[in-house]
Amino acid sequence: MATTKLGNTKSASRAINYAEERAEEKSGLNCDVDYAKSYFKQTRALYGKENGVQAHTVIQSFKPGEVTAKECNEIGLELAKKIAPDYQVAVYTHTDKDHYHNHIIINSVNLETGNKYQSNKEQRDFIKKANDQLCEERGLSVPEKSSEIRYTLAEQNMIDKDKRSWKNDIRMAVEETKDNAVAFEEFNTLLKEKGVEITRVTKNNVTYRHIEEDKKVRGNKLGDSYDKGVIENGFAIEKFRREREEEREYDEYADTFEVDWDAFAENSEDLRKRRIARTEETKQASNKIYIRDERTTGLERKGIAGNQVEFEKDDGGLSR
């Protein structure tokens, strides 16, 4: 079973940095994945569409144990070919614990037309169908639409009679908190604030407990939307969002210390010219001192020579 969730970003580079850093496998469509940032940027610049949304993201998550990292990446690339054939796409596979998932990053601009990728409801439905088709072709389980929420007959009767259902309380608590956590520990803390807690997490399942009613139920009994794989998919998305937010805040902070390189270059050139001028002045002053010293030395030598001549004459006159 593979599920998909869509998003977008105004910084393709940040999305790629995050996905690439943790990737076990990677591949590219219409680009060399090792240089995806450069390829994406060049295409956006070519069509003059560098502002706004720069890339769209699809997180494709698989049921624990169904695929290897390599198979996971291959399916991600196949999905990219179906949903964005004329776009540059980078596919990165993460293997966090048993939760294998792909970060599929689609450049916002079509290579052929220059049109921007549309992430609307129609496209989202198309991506889900394409994903389900790929899973069926590979013999993987496919979630049925009706299984997103599962009601027992007794619970359905309670709902029909407008009576409160403790299971529905758990569903509501999960829905309100699952997109705000990055791990089960944080998720459990948020759930407790709403009267629900997690009592057990296994390889394939998570068990919830309604604290007031003291009743437990496994996530897959509530519906696929409350199962472990889907919850972990939400963790990955929230973690991705937080790291992008941290990078954005850092960039804004760094911008306050941005160097004016033009002014720096101008000042550096001015300093260089002044340094050269000082050097020339020093050389000229040194030459003047040297010439003066030479003249002084010459005169002194003449004076000494004259004295010697006079002394010799006097000495000659007084010689014994």
From Swiss-Prot:
In terms of InterPro entries, this protein maps to: Endonuclease_MobA/VirD2
The entry's keywords: Plasmid
Q: What is the role of this chain? A: This protein is probably required for relaxation complex formation and plasmid mobilization by conjugative plasmids.
Q: What is this protein called?
A: Protein rlx
- What organism does this protein naturally occur in? Staphylococcus aureus
